[in-house]
């Protein structure tokens, strides 16, 4: 079992005066920019809940202390008709040869279903100060047979000369109706490999799926290797509208075994105000793990 000591909320939209960040802040991606700055790339949503990607800089030794933030998006929505014209959402970061790659999910509104989501990729050449899209017209992960509406939230690792990707995509059922009467997507966790960072096969392998009929979403989260195994903390969505964090392990990275009692979150201390402590009472989602010096943090949305 992995024990985590909760430290409370770092920020929300009310902490800033940004016209494009007035609602949800989600999918935090921490990045060690320097010894003095831990940059958290995050999706910042406007009144219509359309996401754009910005950042909040915090103290690496005390992430609750905010040092600065982006006054404009570092990654904006695409032009009308593009795969990301109705929102861009952070997915993961990958560094190689002095370049910082940002993988993201692009949203497009639809008529008969609420949306489609496909993955894009962008790159920063200046240590995360600016980001340029590499996929403007065609997504990195476009639709394929069996995964026609959702191929998003990719995470990449390079091992033994091979790129490995875990991502979220349609399961066999595509869409369902939740307890709230709204259409909800069925999706689980996929895996594939490639010899090239910007080119991926049009087939995948299901790495982790549902445990019961009440679940409809297995969202990619944070993955690391330790003790000869892959460890995964993911987001689990259920038809009653809730989201929580789950845990799974794998020997080969292709087939994960869920360990639903593998996470323990200890409550925040008395030094944290109720406002900062209670932000996650309804749900916990979108985890990202990072070790800074001798401390290991789990950033997430509540």
Residue positions per predicted region:
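Beta-rich carbohydrate-recognition and catalytic domains
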Residues: 1-27, 31-86, 94-153, 157-216, ...
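Charged, gly/pro-rich active-site loop segments
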Residues: 91
């Amino acid at each position: 079992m992995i024990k985590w000591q909760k430290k409370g909320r770092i920020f929300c939209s009310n902490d800033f005066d940004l016209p494009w960040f007035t609602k949800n802040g989600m999918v935090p991606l921490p990045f060690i920019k320097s010894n003095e700055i831990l940059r958290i790339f995050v999706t910042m949503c406007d009144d219509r809940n359309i996401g754009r990607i910005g950042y909040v800089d915090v103290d690496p030794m005390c992430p609750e202390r905010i040092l600065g933030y982006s006054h404009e998006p570092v990654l904006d929505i695409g032009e009308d008709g593009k795969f990301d014209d109705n929102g861009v959402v952070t997915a993961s970061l990958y560094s190689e040869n002095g370049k910082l790659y940002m993988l993201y999910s692009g949203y497009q509104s639809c008529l008969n279903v609420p949306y489609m989501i496909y993955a894009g990729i962008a790159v920063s050449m200046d240590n995360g100060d600016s980001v340029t899209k590499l996929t403007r017209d065609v997504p990195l992960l476009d639709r394929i047979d069996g995964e026609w509406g959702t191929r998003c939230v990719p995470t990449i690792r390079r091992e033994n000369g091979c790129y490995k990707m875990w991502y979220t995509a349609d399961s066999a059922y595509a869409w369902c109706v939740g307890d709230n009467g709204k259409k909800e997507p069925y999706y689980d966790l996929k895996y594939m490999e490639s010899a090239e960072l910007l080119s991926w096969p049009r087939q995948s392998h299901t790495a982790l799926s549902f445990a019961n009929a009440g679940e409809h979403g297995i969202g990619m989260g944070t993955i690391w290797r330790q003790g000869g195994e892959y460890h995964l903390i993911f987001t689990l969505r259920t038809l009653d509208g809730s989201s929580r964090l789950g845990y799974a392990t794998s020997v080969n990275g292709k087939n994960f075994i869920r360990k639903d009692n593998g996470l323990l979150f200890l409550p925040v201390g008395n030094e944290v105000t109720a406002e900062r402590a209670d932000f996650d009472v309804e749900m916990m989602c979108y985890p990202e793990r990072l070790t800074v010096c001798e401390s290991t943090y789990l950033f997430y949305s509540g």
